[in-house]
Amino acid sequence: MSTSVPVKKALSALLRDPGNSHCADCKAQLHPRWASWSLGVFICIKCAGIHRSLGTHISKVKSVDLDTWKEEHLVKLIQFKNNLRANSYYEATLADELKQRKITDTSSLQNFIKNKYEYKKWIGDLSSIEGLNDSTEPVLHKPSANHSLPASNARLDQSSNSLQKTQTQPPSHLLSTSRSNTSLLNLQVSSLSKTTSNTSVTSSATSIGAANTKTGNRVGEFGQRNDLKKSILSLYSKPSAQTQSQNSFFTSTTPQPCNTPSPFVNTGITATNNNSMNSNSSSNISLDDNELFKNVWS
């Protein structure tokens, strides 16, 4: 949050005052940029540190450039206007020789500030300050919004009166509209009840039809299952008398095999005998040939 423009202008105007050209306590530093806004004096940074050591119950310090200022912080500064007028109150009973003395030593400066503000040794009377309560030009210029306040208040009064009249006396056209609205609401309620009854009837009819179709489908499924069972059981049932007689007829008409010997068996036996005879003759020939060769080589 930054300092508003009117407050900045007021601070700059106070600092331009010739009475604020020196520090209010040490009188040695020029152009002070700090202030004790609770005491209403402009001081240097060295004296500001001593003021802070006293505590906020005695002195509240702010920087002109670093801290945020509000209108309430300027009340005491505007009341005294400058350091000369403030010292005429805080140093009223101090000797004239000491009033203009410049203090540079830190310890002596601390004692002086404590005696001046904490112990209030030299404090005077506010009524003795010249022009302190006179009506001078205000340093902080506020926007002239008070002139427009009566007109705005009159408008607010008129609007409030009109609102009260409308609340106390309801117009006739509002009553007629309310009656028409109630009749319309009754018609809408009746139409809604009829539509709900019709929808309930149709929904019940559709539910009954769906139940009938489901039962018909179940009956058809049971019939198909019974047919399948019958066809399967017929495969495993005992044969009837007609099938037994037919089987006996087919068995009686089939021819029985005879025990006559086949000529193929004898022919096989004779062929084997001939083969054995031929092998014996060939073996005899081979032996004779060997004997001939033996005679030749011998």
UniProtKB/Swiss-Prot annotation:
Residues 145-171 have a biased composition (Polar residues). Keywords: Acetylation, Cytoplasm, Golgi apparatus, GTPase activation, Metal-binding, Phosphoprotein, Zinc, Zinc-finger. SUPFAM superfamilies: ArfGap/RecO-like zinc finger. The keyword Amino-acid biosynthesis does not apply. The keyword Ribonucleoprotein does not apply. It is found in: Cytoplasm; Golgi apparatus. Its main location: cytoplasm. GO terms for molecular function: GTPase activator activity; zinc ion binding. Gene3D superfamilies: Arf GTPase activating protein. Residues 137-180 are annotated as: Disordered. The modification N-acetylserine is found at S2. Pfam families: ArfGap (PF01412). PROSITE patterns: ARFGAP. Residues 8-130 form the Arf-GAP domain. InterPro entries: ARF_GTPase-activating, ARFGAP/RecO, ArfGAP_dom, ArfGAP_dom_sf. The modification Phosphoserine is found at S180, S183, S207. Signal peptide: none annotated. Disulfide bonds: none annotated. GO terms for biological process: endoplasmic reticulum to Golgi vesicle-mediated transport; intra-Golgi vesicle-mediated transport. GO terms for cellular component: cytoplasm; cytosol; Golgi apparatus. It comes from the Eukaryota. SMART domains: ArfGap (SM00105). A zinc finger (C4-type) spans 23-47. Present with 5350 molecules/cell in log phase SD medium. GTPase-activating protein for the ADP ribosylation factor family. This is ADP-ribosylation factor GTPase-activating protein effector protein 2. It comes from Saccharomyces cerevisiae (strain ATCC 204508 / S288c). The lineage of its organism: Eukaryota, Fungi, Dikarya, Ascomycota, Saccharomycotina. The gene is AGE2.
